[in-house]
């Protein structure tokens, strides 16, 4: 093994270990992420900023997108993108079951520029279209 390989292995193990040794800090990070995402979807920001991105979330928390994703994967088993999508789909399901908004209105309120993109993501994550979900729930 070359010295570069040894250094790379050491660096990778040190990087991974930081998520274990900083559990309290990372738990606090998860709480901040959850609050930020909830606040984002309960405000006008999706209409102004569009769909929440990992880059935007990381920037608001003064972190790099890669670090945020690695930290969330360590805590939840999901990447930052998967975590955002999970929360977005939960909010969409809430709208579909508690409001009379059309699917297009829900898509726009969540920050999508095109309802088709929302439909595709929703179906990919739930194996049902938003309309099918609404009909199954009612």
Feature annotation, model-predicted:
Residues 3, 71, 88, 121:
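Residues within the DNA-recognition helix of helix-turn-helix
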Residues 120-138:
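…primarily DNA-binding HTH/wHTH and HhH modules…
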Residues 75-113, 135-138:
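Terminal helix-turn-helix DNA-binding modules in bacterial transcription factors
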Residues 55, 66, 102-105, 115-116:
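Residues within helix-turn-helix
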Residues 1-35:
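An amphipathic alpha-helical interaction segment
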Residues 60, 109-110, 125:
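Residues within the alpha-helical elements of helix-turn-helix
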């Amino acid at each position: 093994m070359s010295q570069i390989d040894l250094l790379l292995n050491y660096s990778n193990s040190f990087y991974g270990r930081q998520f274990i040794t900083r559990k309290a800090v990372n738990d606090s990070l998860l709480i901040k992420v959850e609050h930020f995402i909830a606040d984002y979807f309960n405000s006008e920001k999706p209409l102004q900023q569009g769909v929440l991105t990992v880059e935007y979330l990381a920037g608001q928390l003064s972190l790099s997108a890669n670090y945020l994703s690695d930290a969330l994967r360590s805590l939840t088993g999901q990447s930052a993108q998967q975590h955002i999508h999970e929360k977005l789909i939960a909010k969409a399901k809430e709208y579909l079951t508690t409001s009379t908004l059309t699917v297009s209105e829900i898509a726009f309120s969540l920050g999508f520029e095109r309802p088709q993109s929302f439909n595709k993501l929703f179906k990919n994550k739930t194996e049902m279209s938003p309309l099918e979900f609404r009909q199954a729930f009612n």
